[in-house]
């Protein structure tokens, strides 16, 4: 009895170690019992205690094999592992499958396997590989699978020697994935078809690229494999990802973000972009003779998927009298009208391998406006086939990314240099005289009661103005005016880009900048508001000034006699109080008194009534029957276009609006300008 118990101990120990052994016979058990009894001292050190902290610990494997994973046993990094070798399963030993994370549910299984090279996409289902965009030439590659492996066969396809045997430069990538070969597209399609068909079954075709091309740009071919991390110089080990698929996706997004801001003068190799290749080009289209996809009209500068091809420098090489971009070099037009929309080159997708090049549709991509009305199919067909508009010029490109470039050879824009602001300002602005002019205008137009309300509002902030300006000398005042003009210089671009009626005023209420939409809404011309033309407005919105209800002003905005003699010929802008009715002016100055030295980022949003610009002739026209019928037509048909906006409030001379305004301060914390946005209440 004692012998059987002692003899069973080695068998249990062997089973605990995970090694399958044959059951010993009776003689072996007796022999083991003798050795166990006589040599207990020798076997004692060999029995390892699971709780002994000093025992050697087995190194944890990165990923267990399939058999060890199912048995929940410790595996090793080597393949086949020791346990599978002992069990005779070394031929079927391969990495186990882990449960995918939710964000990797659409990732291919091969992408999640560690230790795989650049070709880790499972392309077993891909038997045909197109070698040209029009699909005329294809190479059928048969995949051979390992019969011994039943889990994840590694497909093998024909690989192509893309580069020469000469050593590559540091800009070239070390390996080329066999998924998408690179070909020299300088050869004709017929030559490519013959060479490929004759050498597919004999030996892999070898196409060479010049050494200059390799040193300039390693991505000189029409196709590339995004599955190769070396193509983009990705250091996957430093990205702190547990799988290569997530690291490659993160690196691709970073690569695209890096190249998104490339300007036409940036080098593709400096930003890691694939946008411009060195010398490899597409051949001329054999059907039409037009430049192929990737060839520019002037210098034949090719492009690839990285940068926008329309942003290359080739428009600079055109004739000086040509004011539009040539689109025929991008999309061949002659005899291939369907190429403009359905077969246009697709955008580059980043999800998987080269098969994703055809995933985005050309109809969903930003299209090119050819400069004709596409509602007429006949005209569209003629324009697309010829590539010319009715006047014989090339169609204009309206892509938003070309906005900054189209201005260079279209209608030349006025060059604006902020240095002119500092050179032109030589004298400080006469704010004191302007406030005196404002006070005189308020006394002439408003009733004594409303004049008192405005005076109280201005008197509440007068001490703050005195305190902030008493330490300023002449140089400070000149610098203050330079700050104002420089800020106004920035707001001019904002006003032109914004479609909301906008005006900018000084702290005295004088108009300093105005948008075109405000002039359309109110009828006030920009030159009149800025004081460059005479102010012939007689509309005061039913003024409550003493005496008659009509205005007591002359043809011009009233000015101070001292200012007229001091600065003759100086432009006299219109005051903000001349644009609003009486109640709106009082409300504005009360809000301005609270906001001028209060919250620096505060704003006021309320309603007001803008006064239309009306001369005496306009006032007489408003009383005629023709204008009455025009107003009835507007009420029935609504407002349409610029003419309809201009007719708002034409009868009573007031346009009810909701407006928002804020106060901007200068470096001395003094209110510098007022920015106001208006929207009519229709």
UniProtKB/Swiss-Prot annotation:
Q: Where is the composition biased (Low complexity)?
A: 134-150, 352-366
Which keywords does UniProt give here?
Answer: Activator, DNA-binding, Gluconeogenesis, Metal-binding, Nucleus, Transcription, Transcription regulation, Zinc
Q: Which domain of life is it from?
A: Eukaryota
- Localisation per UniProt entry: Nucleus
- Residue ranges forming the DNA-binding region read 65-93
Report whether Nucleus shows up as a keyword of the record: yes
Tell me one GO molecular function of this protein.
Answer: RNA polymerase II transcription regulatory region sequence-specific DNA binding
UniProt cross-references to InterPro entries, sorted A to Z = ERT1_acuK_gluconeogen_tf, PAS_13, Zn2-C6_fun-type_DNA-bd_sf, Zn2Cys6_DnaBD
Polar residues composition-biased segments: 151-218, 264-287, 314-325, 376-408, 537-565
Q: Extract one GO BP annotation from the record.
A: gluconeogenesis
The record's region (Disordered) falls at 1-58, 131-224, 261-328, 351-418, 537-569
Which Gene3D superfamilies does the record cross-reference, listed alphabetically?
Answer: Zn(2)-C6 fungal-type DNA-binding domain
- SMART domains linked to this entry: GAL4
Alphabetical GO CC annotations of the entry are: nucleus
- Function per UniProt: Transcription factor which regulates nonfermentable carbon utilization. Activator of gluconeogenetic genes.
As for family, the record states: Belongs to the ERT1/acuK family.
Protein name as it appears in the record: Transcription activator of gluconeogenesis acuK
Q: What is the lineage of its organism?
A: Eukaryota, Fungi, Dikarya, Ascomycota, Pezizomycotina
Gene that produces this protein: acuK
